[in-house]
Amino acid sequence: MAAMRAHARRRHPHALMSRAAGLPRLSWFAGLTWFAGGSTGAGCAAHPALAGLTAGARCPAYAAISASTARPAATALPAVAASTARPAATAGTTPATGASGSARPTDAAGMADLARPGVVATHAVRTLGTTGSRAIGLCPSQPLDCPRSPQATLNLGSMGRSLDGPQWRRARVRLCGRWWRRSNTTRGASPRPPSTCRGDNVSMIELEVHQADVTKLELDAITNAANTRLRHAGGVAAAIARAGGPELQRESTEKAPIGLGEAVETTAGDMPARYVIHAATMELGGPTSGEIITAATAATLRKADELGCRSLALVAFGTGVGGFPLDDAARLMVGAVRRHRPGSLQRVVFAVHGDAAERAFSAAIQAGEDTARR
């Protein structure tokens, strides 16, 4: 065993996880190593600190995958599998699947091997592309759930964007000391496409501007520019309270007061939306500021994700009773949406009144797109 460890250190130094990368020290066989040149190697060991990506076992509560940055990226690398009781798999083969790619049952001896700590897993783990980084680890508090999966696919094509199996739930992936959050997806579903405007780790939010009555929009949630006491007495707030009925104001009173820049939800009452998210943009009758508008927008987006909303209508915060300049409010709100890393949220509609408001928000969206392209 000592000789094998020494050989691994000489041959595959990148398989060792260092504390400098923010990961705990693991044994040499805890990592999955791969080669772009078509050769095979040992990989994916069932270490006591890890649960192997194998049939009959849950996906790891903490999996470490190391990849060499010196190798060129590949669209589909050969399967890597090895066992202390079986010869290593030939490059391009997949021991856990048949010729058609369908799952093949595992024999009892193989299952017994997988249950023993320290024995190299017999099932293939395929890597697609490269992360351009040394290591990736799964947060131990959010394990993936892949019961009885004969083959798991680690898609490392875009900085650890996805780690998929037949069944999985939300997970967080640690990459080079930073947290990247997976989209909130139902079991068995495929992740949504990555964003092209704010980074590969988040999903795209469609931005729209409409001159519309926010109380008539059939979306998951609409927003209300409220005061900290949630008394909906004037402007858009009064229109929302009238359209929602007495239940909306009753719920608001129960949840009041809230702090400036905070957001709470109530039911939408008689309106077609499911929720109303009330964001406190000012004190009762008082002015607002750019910092409050930015904080209120961010809090509204987070609340929409917490509620599992896919679509959200935003009104122009602070531009009515608050007296904040329309162009500045549009720029701040669009910027907050672009910085937001969504969970369930896919569509944001800016519901505005008048041509001036429509031009302001449309210009803010266009300016953000021009900046992203540069």
Swiss-Prot record:
It comes from the Bacteria. This is Uncharacterized protein MT1950. Residues 86-104 have a biased composition (Low complexity). Residues 86-109 are annotated as: Disordered. PROSITE patterns: MACRO. It holds the Pfam family Macro. Coiled coil: none annotated. SMART domains: A1pp (SM00506). Residues 179-354 form the Macro domain. The lineage of its organism: Bacteria, Bacillati, Actinomycetota, Actinomycetes, Mycobacteriales. PANTHER family: GANGLIOSIDE INDUCED DIFFERENTIATION ASSOCIATED PROTEIN 2-RELATED, MACRO DOMAIN-CONTAINING PROTEIN.
